[in-house]
Amino acid sequence: MTEIRNNWTKEEISAIYNSPILDLMYRGATVHREFHDPQEVQVCTLLSIKTGGCPEDCSYCPQAARYHTDVKVEKLMDVKDVLNSALEAKESGSTRFCMGAAWREVRDNKDFDKVIDMVKGVSTMGMEVCCTLGMLTPEQADKLKDAGLYAYNHNLDTSAEHYDKVITTRTYDDRLETLDNVRNAKISVCSGGIIGMGESHGDRVGMLHTLANMVEHPESVPVNALVPVEGTPLEDQPRVSVWEMVRMIATARIIMPKAMVRLSAGRVRMNTEEQALCFLAGANSIFAGDKLLTTPNPEVNADKEMFQVLNLKPRQSFKNGDAPKIKFEQIPSALVK
């Protein structure tokens, strides 16, 4: 039985990450089968509920106000429109619905009240509800938990050492503090990062080291390949190869056996064969839908065809934890189509 550890050294993780690729894939696949059904893949939908105009300077992000990209600033969506999108996601097979807002941090205002209503509404649909809204205070995390939030995404993005080369408007410790607030509120932690931002292999190991040595491993670990966007500082970064993704996914699977390892951004550039390598290495979650916030993603029909070819089946909701025990009144009919 593989031991669940929170005391990994960078040297140990580096040895795993740098092992021969076929050996690494085999080990990742073996651990994956020990803890998960290898034919099960979690299908998630990510919706941008507030787009563009972000005051931060994340070098990869087309939603930063300071960069000249094609992203148009949009205000926070209406609650009924978000709930309709959630219903459509459920009908298409998603079991987790994540709402993302281009904010630096959550503020205690009417917009946050609307997000609380969105969380309450989606939680009545039988899906895992996730948000990614920026930095959170302990009190805000508690409010989201009380509303029925299942998971909160707040990525580390990269290693502590490389972080300042990518972002300067918030610190690495700011990110870790938000994750602590989420965990203390008994909300599942979703945290991973992006590769292809000019970091070294040592930086990738460093990020995995931080994730694997948290008090509890994240419930979900998104592994993103940079999708360079014209107008951002990282627009000319070379494409991340499938083998780089396989190394990250297999290593994450080995050192965080129970986590959902999500094959996230960059999947649109992969064919079915390349995605199959990632699933074999230990990935067991994807984002479905034509967009990931503002970047392209494979079409729903293409994913359905891939599931058929690879004999994959959607994972049911709440297999990693209990559904919210709070009961809400039925969604008012005026809020949904």
UniProtKB/Swiss-Prot annotation:
Pfam families hit by this protein: BATS (PF06968), Radical_SAM (PF04055)
Protein name per the record: Biotin synthase
Name of the gene encoding the protein in the UniProt record: bioB
Assembly and interaction partners: Homodimer.
Reported cofactor(s): [4Fe-4S] cluster; [2Fe-2S] cluster
CDD domains: Radical_SAM
Matching SUPFAM superfamilies: Radical SAM enzymes
One record GO biological process: biotin biosynthetic process
Function, as annotated: Catalyzes the conversion of dethiobiotin (DTB) to biotin by the insertion of a sulfur atom into dethiobiotin via a radical-based mechanism.
Cofactor mode of binding and number, as noted: Binds 1 [4Fe-4S] cluster. The cluster is coordinated with 3 cysteines and an exchangeable S-adenosyl-L-methionine.
Gene3D superfamilies hit by this protein: Aldolase class I
